[in-house]
Amino acid sequence: MIWKRHLTLDELNATSLNTMVAHLAIVYTRLGDDVLEAEMPVDARTHQPFGLLHGGASAALAETLGSMAGYLMTRDGQCVVGTELNATHHRAVSQGKVRGVCQPLHLGRQSQSWEIVIFDEQGRRCCTCRLGTAVMG
């Protein structure tokens, strides 16, 4: 397991209370050896005006996952801040849920890079994101 902090899924989800993460109904669903996953509904909260998943909602899911994964890689007295987010949208989603899967690309002392892939309920890749974070403290 790569994580330096050891939190349960319940503890991870508790960090979302009264935040945009809760408003978008993003829920952490899996913490594996080197992977963090979350789900987000595709509904009125996350739609753009034409009834499809908003690209900004996908970006919010990606940044949520990458930032939390980055935090899990820090020690006491440290935190991470996002420095860059890139998202490539591959497929539209109009309903159901999407699942984000976050894995590290680079884990340095001062910077991290994360890949977040978003899948629809049929397991099709809908969006590929890369998040850069800086380690503070």
UniProtKB/Swiss-Prot annotation:
Q: In which pathway does it act?
A: Siderophore biosynthesis; enterobactin biosynthesis
What's the domain of life for this entry? Bacteria
Q: What class of enzyme is it?
A: hydrolase
Predominant location category = cytoplasm
Is ATP-binding tagged as a keyword?
Answer: no
The record's annotation in Pfam families points to: 4HBT
The answer to keyword Nucleotide-binding applying to this record is no
Q: Where is the active site?
A: 63 (nucleophile or proton acceptor)
Q: Under the cellular component aspect of Gene Ontology, which terms does the record hold?
A: cytosol
Where can this protein be found?
Answer: Cytoplasm
Q: Which NCBIfam families does the record associate with it?
A: PRK10254.1, unchar_dom_1
Family membership noted in the UniProt record: Belongs to the thioesterase PaaI family.
Function summary = Required for optimal enterobactin synthesis. Acts as a proofreading enzyme that prevents EntB misacylation by hydrolyzing the thioester bound existing between EntB and wrongly charged molecules.
- What quaternary arrangement does the UniProt entry report? Homotetramer. Dimer of dimers. Interacts specifically with the aryl carrier protein (ArCP) domain of EntB.
Q: Under what name is this protein listed? A: Proofreading thioesterase EntH
This protein's species is Citrobacter koseri (strain ATCC BAA-895 / CDC 4225-83 / SGSC4696)
Report the gene name: entH
